[in-house]
Curated annotation (Swiss-Prot):
This is Probable 6-phosphofructo-2-kinase C222.13c. GO terms for cellular component: cytosol; nucleus. The active site is at D235, C266, H527 (proton donor). It catalyses: beta-D-fructose 6-phosphate + ATP = beta-D-fructose 2,6-bisphosphate + ADP + H(+). Residues 57-66 have a biased composition (Basic and acidic residues).
Length: 592
């Protein structure tokens, strides 16, 4: 290249902070800020095999003559950019912290870690290698390990189990690995598991606990690598930076597995005491009386508090590390460096986490003309019996609402809980936008209930098969009809608007999160398949049970959920006597 071109380039870049040589040590601070790297800027010939990702030959073609008409040769005519004024510069501009430098990707054709993008089962497909043809995870390429952090009785296991249920319901292959379960399995015959067992000064038990934690991690890694796992949740206290770094270093040896710490902190004394009373009902205190269990658990908590190291700047130094701090089971959420799609889903869920006790009622629309004719789908109105069901449903819910408020008031008086009574009076009524569903909620007073029609609650769209009877469907399209029996959740029915089960699941995702967020009671009036999908989530059924769960016509289900667990009660409608009768023996998995 000509010297003239170099001179023009030097003149063009002069004063912009992009000169091709490093400034002298006696330059002013502003000039130094333009050179965050300790190494001189590279010239065209200074590249190395480590940093080069382009064919070397392109730098050796000096015989090529530049186009004289190119705008690049009019550099003298171009206005030289002015330096950035000092007042416009960021406080730490040019001074990347160590943890920020670790996130930069090494130049090259193959980056060290590929960026995570959207992965939704049944809706996205990632290109996979020939040796990774198993479709059990529906083409999900990203993998994530969530490591729980926190002292006992802060709610971390509760949060982890809720996350596991949420991911599995969305059809991500997720599994919960409990270090405590493995500790009890391997050490119950040797150790007493009392508070002294958890003392970090007890070298024997400390070594045993460390080994159990690493063994559990190895089980998790084996499952993710060899059994098509997508998300693994490691449940343990992981209370020191040294332990967390050890886990991080081991996981980092495996390719393309994201790591996220999830720390649960509890600063609310009332909530912490409730967690303490809940934890003594767990397997660590089987055979203990209440007083002895409380005493031992408090001693264990005091030991952990003495040595506990919360997530801080030291953890942030670990390359690519993501973490979430959940304070008081979702009252406050703090995040750091959340990049992956799967990690983002966890944060989204944490922001809507709610431990308030509440009722979730589910029912199908009343009997419709299409129901009588045996047709699937469609948009028919209710029959006279269906309208009667709608009227009696509203009356029954009015009575149940009063009973709930009485229970709630008594609960507040007896336990001094921290929630306000006004929350007990909140009641939402949702339905799909189909005629039969809208007519089923017709008798709910909008002045007393928050009534909404939501298109997301529409039933599975069978495309061109809508309006057929089951017999017509099975005879004309036996292959598609067999899809239901084969439980192919990714199969999308043909015809305009046709959906798959996975389409419906992800269509319902924002409603699930909204129900999790809401502190009030709710009645959902939707259709058979949608109701099945909702029931499998709230009752934590296996994801493959979606098709097997049966919600009969004119049956009402009440789910009561809080951090202590979930209960479900069925009420059958007696049309002759116009009343709902509690049925404690009803089995959801038996189709009726």
């Amino acid at each position: 290249m000509s010297n003239t071109g170099s001179a023009r380039t030097e003149e063009f870049t002069k004063g912009t902070g992009y000169e091709a040589t490093k400034p002298n040590n006696d330059t002013d601070d502003d000039a130094k800020q333009n050179y965050p790297s300790k190494e001189p800027h590279m010239k065209l010939g200074d590249y190395t095999e480590e940093t080069s990702f382009v064919d070397d030959s392109i730098f050796k073609r000096e015989e090529l003559t530049p186009d004289r008409n190119s705008p690049a040769n009019d550099v003298e005519k171009m206005e030289v950019p002015k330096p950035t004024p000092q007042w416009m510069k960021l406080k730490d501009e040019g001074k990347l912290g160590k943890h920020r430098k670790n996130r930069l990707r090494r130049p090259g054709r193959f980056p060290v870690r590929q960026e995570s993008t959207i992965d939704i089962p049944g809706l996205t497909v990632s290109k996979r290698t020939e040796n990774d043809s198993n479709n059990a995870s529906y083409g999900i390429r990203e993998k994530l390990i969530i490591i729980l952090v926190g002292i006992p009785a802060t709610g971390k296991s509760y949060i982890g189990s809720k996350l596991s249920r949420y991911y599995n319901w969305l059809k991500y292959n997720c599994r919960f690995f409990s270090v405590g379960d493995k500790r009890r399995e391997e050490g119950a015959s040797t150790y007493s598991m009392s508070a002294d067992f958890f003392d970090i000064k007890n070298e024997e038990t400390f070594k045993f606990r460390e080994n159990v934690a690493l063994e559990t991690l190895e089980d998790l890694l084996h499952w993710m690598i060899h059994e098509n796992g997508v998300i693994g949740i490691l449940d343990a206290t992981n209370s020191t930076h040294e332990r967390r770094k050890h886990l991080y270093d081991r996981i980092s040896k495996e390719a393309d597995i994201g790591i996220m710490f999830l720390e649960s902190l509890c600063t609310d004394d009332i909530l912490f005491e409730e967690n303490i009373k809940l934890k003594i009902k767990g397997p660590d205190y089987e055979g203990y009386d209440t007083e002895s269990a409380l005493k031992d658990l408090r001693e264990r908590v005091d030991l952990y508090k003495k040595y506990y190291e919360p997530l801080d700047e030291r953890d942030e130094q670990l390359p690519f590390l993501q973490y979430v701090k959940v304070i008081n089971v979702g009252i406050k959420v703090v995040t750091h460096n959340i990049e992956g799609f799967l990690a983002g889903q966890a944060v989204y869920f944490m922001l809507n986490l709610n431990i308030q006790k509440r009722q979730i009622w589910l029912t199908r629309p009343g009997e419709s003309l299409d129901t009588v004719a045996g047709r699937i789908g469609g948009d028919a109105s209710l029959t006279p019996i269906g309208k009667q069901y709608a009227q009696d449903l509203a009356n029954f819910m009015d009575r149940q609402r009063v009973l709930w408020q009485l229970r709630y008031t008594n609960d507040l008086a007896s336990t001094n809980k921290r929630f306000s009574l006004s929350e007990a009076s909140s009641f939402n009524v949702w339905s799909s936008v189909r005629k039969r569903a809208i007519e089923t909620i017709e008798f709910f007073n909008p002045d007393s209930y928050n009534v909404k029609k939501i298109r997301l609650l529409n039933d599975l769209n069978l495309g061109s098969r809508e309006g057929l009877t089951l017999r017509e469907f099975s005879e004309k399209y036996p292959d598609e009809f067999d899809v239901i029996k084969r439980k192919d959740y990714a199969y999308r029915f043909s015809g305009q608007g046709g959906e798959s089960y996975l389409d419906v699941i992800h269509r319902l995702q924002p409603l699930i999160v909204e129900i999790e967020r809401s502190s009030g009671n709710i009645l959902v009036v939707s259709h058979r398949i949608v109701s099945n999908i909702l029931m499998t989530y709230f009752l934590n059924y296996h994801p493959e049970d979606i098709i097997d769960v049966g919600l009969p016509l004119h049956t009402l289900f009440c789910i009561e959920s809080d951090r202590y667990g979930t209960t479900c009660m069925a009420y059958r409608y007696d049309a002759a006597n116009r009343q709902f009768i509690k049925d404690p023996m009803f089995d959801l998995r038996k189709r009726t």
